[in-house]
Amino acid sequence: MQETTISILGAGAWGASLANLAIANGNRVRVWSRRGSETLSAVLQGADIVLSAISMKGVREVASQIQSLTPSPETIFVTATKGLEPETIYTPSQIWQSCFPHHPVVVLSGPNLSKEIDQSLPAATVVASRVATAAATVQLAFSSSRFRVYTNPDPVGVELGGTLKNVIAIASGVCDGLHLGTNAKAALVTRGLTEMVRIGNCWGAKTETFYGLSGLGDLLATCNSPLSRNYQVGYQLAGGETLAQILAKLPGTAEGVNTCQVLVQLARQQNIVIPITEQVYRLLQGEVTPQQALDELMLRDIKPEYN
C-alpha cells in the first residue's frame, strides 16, 4: 500500500491521539502546533490529508493561513474539531469548505475519549463526506484492529452529533453532581438526544445519523465519563463552583460552553424547542442554580413524548 502523508494540525490530546493512530498504520505523519518549531508551510508540504484537531476558536485563522499556501488540488481536508463559530454559526467543516470550495472535506467524529485511545482500548468512529472516495481514503488511513472507522454520507449530521452532545454532557455532569440517580440520567440523555435531532434537522442533517456512533454513541460516552471536560464543567457547577473557577483550572477547552450560547441563539430565531439546552445556558450564565434548573425542567407543561 502506498504511504499516505498526513499533516495533523493541533498537538493537544486529540491531535496527538490521531497522530499516533496514523503512525501505527504506517502513514507518514507531521504535526503542527502553535507552540511548535516547525512552520505551517513545512508541515503541509506534500500532504495527502490535512487533519485539523485545533480548538474551534482557531479554525478560521488557520484555514485562512493555509489558503495562502495553495495546497495541492488533491489534498483532502479532515476536521476533527467539535464546536460552532459564534459569529456565523458555521460548523468547522463549513469553515474549511468555504476556504477550500474545490477540495473534499471529511468530518471525523465519534465516541472517542483520547485517553482510552492512547491506552489502545478498542474504539470506533465515523468519517463523513459528500465525496465518498475521500471518506474511504481517510477510513483506510486510520482503521486498525483497535480503531474501527465507518463511513457516512451525512457530514452535517455526523459533525453536529459531536458538537451538540457537548451541551447535554454538561447537563449530565450536573445530574451526577447532584446525585439524581440512574432514572434521571436516562431521561436526561434520551430527551437530550431529542433536542439534538431537532437542531440537526433544522440544519438539514438526517435523523438516523443521530442514532449512530457520532450521535448517540458520542453522547453516551461523553455523558458517562469523568474524562470529558464538558461533563466536568457540569459536575463542578453542581458542586458549587462558578464557571470562571472551573474554566480557569480546566485542562483544554470545554467546547460545550460556547456551543450552548450559539445553540440558544439559533433556537430562539428558528423557534426550536430545546428546554435542556436552555437551562444549561441559564446555568452557565449564572441565572439559575443547578437545583432551580432541574425544577424548571420537571415542572414544564406535560405533553406527549412525540409530537
Swiss-Prot record:
NADPH binds at W14, R34, R35, K82, S114, R229, E255. Transmembrane segments: none annotated. Its main location: cytoplasm. The keyword Oxidoreductase applies. Sn-glycerol 3-phosphate binds at K82, G110, K165, D218, S228, R229, N230. It is found in: Cytoplasm. SUPFAM superfamilies: 6-phosphogluconate dehydrogenase C-terminal domain-like, NAD(P)-binding Rossmann-fold domains. Keywords: Cytoplasm, Lipid biosynthesis, Lipid metabolism, NAD, NADP, Nucleotide-binding, Oxidoreductase, Phospholipid biosynthesis, Phospholipid metabolism. InterPro entries: 6-PGluconate_DH-like_C_sf, 6PGD_dom2, G3P_DH_NAD-dep, G3P_DH_NAD-dep_C, G3P_DH_NAD-dep_N, NAD(P)-bd_dom_sf. GO terms for biological process: carbohydrate metabolic process; glycerol-3-phosphate biosynthetic process; glycerol-3-phosphate catabolic process; glycerophospholipid metabolic process; phospholipid biosynthetic process. One of its GO terms (cellular component) is cytosol. The active site is at K165 (proton acceptor). Pathway: Membrane lipid metabolism; glycerophospholipid metabolism. Its EC number is 1.1.1.94. The keyword NADP applies. GO terms for molecular function: glycerol-3-phosphate dehydrogenase [NAD(P)+] activity; NAD binding. It catalyses: sn-glycerol 3-phosphate + NAD(+) = dihydroxyacetone phosphate + NADH + H(+); sn-glycerol 3-phosphate + NADP(+) = dihydroxyacetone phosphate + NADPH + H(+). Belongs to the NAD-dependent glycerol-3-phosphate dehydrogenase family. PANTHER family: GLYCEROL-3-PHOSPHATE DEHYDROGENASE (PTHR11728), GLYCEROL-3-PHOSPHATE DEHYDROGENASE [NAD(+)] 2, CHLOROPLASTIC (PTHR11728:SF1). Catalyzes the reduction of the glycolytic intermediate dihydroxyacetone phosphate (DHAP) to sn-glycerol 3-phosphate (G3P), the key precursor for phospholipid synthesis. This is Glycerol-3-phosphate dehydrogenase [NAD(P)+]. It comes from Nostoc sp. (strain PCC 7120 / SAG 25.82 / UTEX 2576). The gene is gpsA.
